[in-house]
Amino acid sequence: NALFILGNIGNNDVNYAFPDRAIEEIRFYVPFITEAVANATREIIR
């Protein structure tokens, strides 16, 4: 048995990665971040 936890990056990570960026620009990246987390989850489950 194993337990693993994956999730989207936190607010601090977003603030660090995208300083001085408009929220609209940051929102562009949300689907890519979500897809990366979903893909990683699928790989771990396999």
From Swiss-Prot:
Its EC number is 3.1.1.80. Belongs to the 'GDSL' lipolytic enzyme family. Glycans are attached at residue 39. It catalyses: 17-O-acetylajmaline + H2O = ajmaline + acetate + H(+); 17-O-acetylnorajmaline + H2O = norajmaline + acetate + H(+). Keywords: Alkaloid metabolism, Glycoprotein, Hydrolase. Deacetylates 17-O-acetylajmaline and 17-O-acetylnorajmaline, but is inactive toward other acetylated alkaloids. The lineage of its organism: Eukaryota, Viridiplantae, Streptophyta, Embryophyta, Tracheophyta. Transmembrane segments: none annotated. The keyword Glycoprotein applies. One of its GO terms (molecular function) is acetylajmaline esterase activity. GO terms for biological process: alkaloid metabolic process. This is Acetylajmalan esterase. Coiled coil: none annotated. It comes from Rauvolfia verticillata.
